[in-house]
Regions:
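Extended alpha-helical coiled-coil rod segments
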Residues: 1-199
Length: 200
């Protein structure tokens, strides 16, 4: 009936309005707890998917009322309402996928920053080992220093993949245009330069 449609349409418009507030909040701009925010958003997406049938059935109900001329002369109003619900639903879906993308990018940035921090710390240790003035005082100490140096060289070589991953991640973040590209480039270049120096 028309009354049922009106009640359901009111309910669904209110529900979409509530969900839009969640879909358009910019919590992704604060990098703290980004993984938890991403998980919450995935649950939010699942909730939207679970309600898609409900929205489709309200739209179908409205179209049916219009087609059968059961709108008590309010066909245009019902038609307009259907248009509004359809537009709001599309807008909600678009904003939700946009937020999903931004959360993924923010998560990538968190991963990048953590990797920079780890590699920065590791490079600091390597640099202090390579700066050592100790050249050994006898054959045994020289052999120990050579072994130590070989281990450092092996460690440096073993970090090559992590450096490549860091560069790929930086590239992806810069291309997305979501974040401060200059800062990302500066961090990446600093790591690459220090790594190149440690390799020589």
């Amino acid at each position: 009936t028309l009354q049922q449609f009106s009640r359901d349409a009111d309910e669904i418009e209110n529900w979409i309005g509530e969900k839009l507030q969640m879909a358009t909040d910019e919590s992704y701009k604060d990098p703290s707890n980004i993984q938890s925010k991403h998980q919450k958003h995935q649950a939010f997406e699942a909730e939207l998917a679970a309600n898609a049938d409900r929205i489709e059935s309200i739209i179908a109900m409205g179209k049916n009322l219009v087609d059968k001329h059961q709108c008590a002369g309010s066909e245009d109003a019902v038609q307009q309402r259907l248009g509004t619900i359809t537009e709001q639903w599309k807008y909600l879906a678009a904003k939700t996928s946009e937020k999903s993308l931004k959360l993924k990018e923010a998560n990538k940035q968190r991963t990048f920053n953590a990797a920079v921090k780890d590699i920065d710390f590791w490079l600091g240790e390597v640099e202090s080992l390579l700066k050592s003035e100790d050249s050994g005082k006898d054959l045994t100490s020289v052999q120990n220093l050579i072994k130590k140096h070989q281990l450092v060289e092996a460690d440096i070589a073993a970090h090559e993949d992590r450096i490549k991953d860091l560069n790929a991640l930086a590239e992806s973040l810069v291309e997305s245009g979501q974040f401060d590209s200059d800062t990302i480039e500066d961090k990446r270049n600093s790591i690459n330069e220090r790594y190149a120096v440690s390799y020589t």
